[in-house]
């Protein structure tokens, strides 16, 4: 059996060979990457930083089709990485990342339907930079200790949330404890953020989409706050609208590039209604856009 670090080392070796030869950009495509291929992108981020420094301009564009890579995808990723997965991801994705771009999108199954597009536990744990897009769901503790990165969770609410049934996490897009101890960064949540959110959050901003037509209102968001979470819900501000234009604009462009025009149009429609649809979760007493 191949070692668990085989593919990440292979990608790193191939890219570094091209970088040393003078190429500023390399492209790598693969398919059916599975759970035994761990920490994909991590080796390359480290090798590039050691040899060219953290501010080097090299870029590796990695595209993985029909894939669900193993734990630690993009972990400690840097600005050298631009990675898109059609399929899904597992635990520890984008953990400790300092830059770069990652998109986890739905893949096409044997019936031609788009499925999955989700990621595992502790997504973007402690990330200080980078832009991360997830089309569907994330397991528990998404964006905890995040301190400067940007994230978009694109799963949308399309039916009644049924809070009266309890067990909120089972139907939520984020499965609990999201944004715990978050100190900076920007997050957009198009779906249900799940229970026990924002515990110990002291910085950054979360933009939450509302769906009053499905019973998901500001009160629904308050119901999901962790006990003693010191955050407040504010109307969307001017700078907040600019953030949404930037982050959701990038997400819409990524959906269109992956041949998902219908989903891109649905997200664009939410963005067009941003003042009515979105509110901001910010630490109590702190400006939402502090430097």
Q: Where do the language-model regions lie?
A:
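Long, distal/terminal scaffolding or interaction modules
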Residues: 1-291
């Amino acid at each position: 059996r191949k070692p668990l670090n085989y593919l990440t080392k292979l990608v790193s070796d191939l890219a570094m060979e091209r970088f040393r030869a003078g190429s500023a950009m390399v492209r790598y495509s693969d398919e059916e990457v599975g759970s035994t291929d761990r920490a994909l992108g991590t080796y390359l981020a480290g090798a590039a930083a050691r040899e060219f420094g953290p501010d080097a301009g090299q870029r590796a564009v990695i595209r993985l089709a029909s894939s669900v890579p193993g734990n630690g995808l993009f972990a400690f990723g840097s600005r050298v990485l631009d990675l898109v997965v059609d399929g899904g991801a597992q635990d520890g994705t984008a953990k400790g990342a300092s830059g770069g771009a990652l998109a986890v999108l739905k893949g096409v199954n044997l019936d031609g339907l788009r499925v999955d597009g989700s990621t595992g536990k502790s997504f973007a744990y402690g990330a200080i930079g980078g832009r991360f897009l997830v089309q569907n769901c994330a397991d528990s503790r998404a964006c905890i200790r995040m301190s400067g990165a940007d994230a978009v969770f694109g799963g949308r609410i399309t039916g009644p949330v049924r809070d009266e049934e309890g067990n909120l996490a089972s139907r939520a897009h984020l499965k609990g404890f999201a944004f715990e101890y978050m100190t900076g960064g920007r997050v957009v949540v198009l779906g249900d953020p799940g229970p026990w959110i924002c515990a110990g959050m002291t910085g950054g901003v979360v933009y939450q989409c509302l769906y009053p037509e499905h019973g998901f209102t500001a009160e629904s968001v308050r119901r999901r706050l962790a006990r003693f979470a010191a955050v407040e819900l504010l109307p969307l501000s001017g700078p907040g609208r600019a953030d949404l234009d930037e982050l959701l604009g990038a997400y819409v462009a990524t959906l269109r590039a992956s041949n998902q025009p219908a989903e891109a149009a649905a997200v664009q429609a939410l963005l067009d209604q941003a003042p009515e649809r979105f509110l901001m979760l910010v630490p109590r007493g702190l400006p939402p856009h502090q430097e």
